[in-house]
A protein has these predicted regions:
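N-terminal Rossmann NAD(P)H-binding glycine-rich loop of SDR-like oxidoreductase domains
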Residues: 4-25
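Active-site helix of classical SDR
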Residues: 143, 147-150
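Conserved Rossmann-fold NAD(P)-dependent oxidoreductase catalytic core, especially the SDR/UDP-sugar
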Residues: 100-143
């Protein structure tokens, strides 16, 4: 059985490039782009399946996963630092509920694999900035950083307790050539 991949948050800086690359590897029909917003001339819509999705709508998320028989989820939806600070409750709800829903999908065996990016925002200002070790002081000072640190712990927990295959990378501030810097840079 070929993998079917759902990319949540596909209209963002990373998502747009990721969907294009995944479609070149897995085939256009095997990579479902999803986002809360959709541009009318969006290449993601023209090149393969697109599902409008507010990732905080757990029922709709489950419906999409079942409809396409999704095997992998790339969860990129998040409220980043600059936009999260004035919207603390929304940021926490979006950043944590979405991860919880996707982890539960894997725990319940609907999907096989999760990719969820973390961020250097987990460190905060007290972390050594030169040759930062993997295991070090983590004192995030933004709601985004706090949610990413909590998310890392949840991913570890689900992996250890339920054998969920979840992978993550701590991204630095990213700037792409196709999009303007947004809420995180």
């Amino acid at each position: 059985m070929k993998d079917t991949i759902l990319v949540i948050g596909s209209s963002g800086q990373i998502g747009t490039e990721l969907v294009n690359e995944l479609r070149s590897v897995y085939g256009n029909s095997n990579v479902i782009a999803s986002d809360i917003r959709q541009k009318k001339s969006d290449i993601l819509v023209e090149s393969g399946p697109f599902e409008p999705l507010d990732v905080m709508d757990k029922e709709l998320l489950y419906k999409i996963v079942k409809k396409y028989q999704v095997t992998q989820v790339y969860l990129l939806a998040a409220l980043l630092s600059a936009k999260a600070e004035p919207n603390i409750e929304l940021a926490w709800k979006l950043n944590m509920s979405s991860l919880s829903y996707v982890l539960d999908l894997a725990k319940e065996k609907y999907i096989k694999k999760i990719f969820w990016p973390s961020s250097i925002a987990v460190f905060g200002t007290t972390t050594p900035s030169i040759m930062t070790p993997q295991h070090t002081i983590m004192e995030p000072n933004t709601v985004y950083g706090i949610s990413k640190l909590a998310g890392e712990r949840w991913c570890e927990y689900y992996h250890q307790k339920f054998k969920v295959d979840v992978r993550s990378v701590r991204y630095p501030g990213l700037i792409g050539w196709r999009s303007q810097p947004g809420g995180g840079t």
